Amino acid sequence: MNFPILSSLILLPVIGALFLFFTKDKDGNNLTAKYVSLFTAAVNFLISIYLWITFDQSISSFQFIEDREWIDGFINYKVGVDGISILFIILTTFITPLCIISVNNTVKTRLRDFLIAILIMESFMIGVFCALDLVVFYLFFEAGLIPMFLIIGIWGGPKRVYSAFKFFLYTLLGSVLMLVAIISIYWISGTTDVIKLYEFGIDEKYQNLLWLAFFSSFAVKTPMWPFHTWLPDAHVEAPTAGSVLLAAILLKMAGYGFIRFSLGLFPVASEVFTPLIYGLSVIAIVFTSLIALMQEDMKKLIAYSSVAHMGFVTLGIFTIQQQGIEGSIIQMISHGLVSAALFLCVGVVYDRMHSRLISSYGGIVTIIPKYSILFMLFTLAALGLPGTSGFIGEFLILMGVFKDNFLVAVIASLGVILGAAYMLWLYKRVVFGKLVNKDLTKMVDLNKSEYFILSCLAIPTLFFGFYPDPLINTIEVSVSDLINMYNNNLINK
């Protein structure tokens, strides 16, 4: 029997969390909790790298499949990965240890409980990207809400309870219809096995309603306009590590869901509703970019920029073009790196000055130069400068959209200009200009842990900007197979 590497990736964070739950530091400094959680997350990252190295990129089918009977005659615990899902697993295992390192500076109370929540959340997120059964996917997908709800509600800002419940209710209500749809799929097809559903298809007459049910969940979690209003509040109140996990990983689960399920299971309905997705996506890109230009809170500005970036993602997915879908996946990976870095950059200055207002800063370039340089890099990556990972995804998406719908592509291109406007405006006001506050002179530059975390994010941001082949080679065959399956199902219908 082959080693269950995917189950190990899912279970290892849970084991680490249980160890933390049942042990205590005698001196109360939580050193054991810090080292155990970091060791657990680091080992998980190394396992995911081994998974990537041993993954056969020439095969389009799922690999490392584990299939075990769970509920007799109904549900199997079935997990596996293809070229699409493996990148999201690596992103998850890469971001998690960086979040754990960052909490030393940001979490002052109940640190052990916070680390337990992060590890549990990592387990659920990996499960989402591995799941090959609809019920298993749904359980992981919804379970991820619980630790994030606690992270915002316990360790968040003054309005944390309101923001936590808003986040929880929005995302939970959006998923009720998806649960009904999964039960309906089992009633229609007699299975919730994703691979079997790919092979046999779902009757065309049911697809529209089922697609809308899945859309109700994915649109809220992406989030797409107009379902995005929970996100700025959640980001503003969440602690820095919570914002990083929310932006870098949690939003990507919905984008992944659109690719894996909306396109894979409901091709006829996806063709019908593509104009809807295009419309909502371009509104998200342009409208939320304009809102970002009006923000005075740094976290809110970055939150609205996330909605705009995810608008590009949904646009690219529904082009059903090789470049469009590949661009969307790369954009999600890049956004995971860059948005994590931007929220960490906000966290750095907030820890020192206890303000997120842009007007509280200015002229800090000579005071904290290392911070200013790294902040500039991530600002340029967020606006899609060539040579950064942000450029590759946006460029491929726009190539795919131009092939499919010229007018939509032209409107979406405005988002590139607006993105440059709000990101450069943010950077100019925070870093350059006159020193508006004498207290800023007391700021100290990045400490060792902050410099390490931001450097870890800067390296792949630059590397994949100049050399995206490792990402493209990993996803190319799986994306091509998905498009062929999509087109064949349309022809057969």
Kindly label every feature range from the protein language model.
Residues M1-S7, I15, F19-I116, I195, ...:
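Transmembrane helix-loop-helix hairpins at membrane boundaries of multipass inner-membrane proteins
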Residues E142:
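Short phosphate-coordinating micro-motif centered on Lys-Gly-acidic
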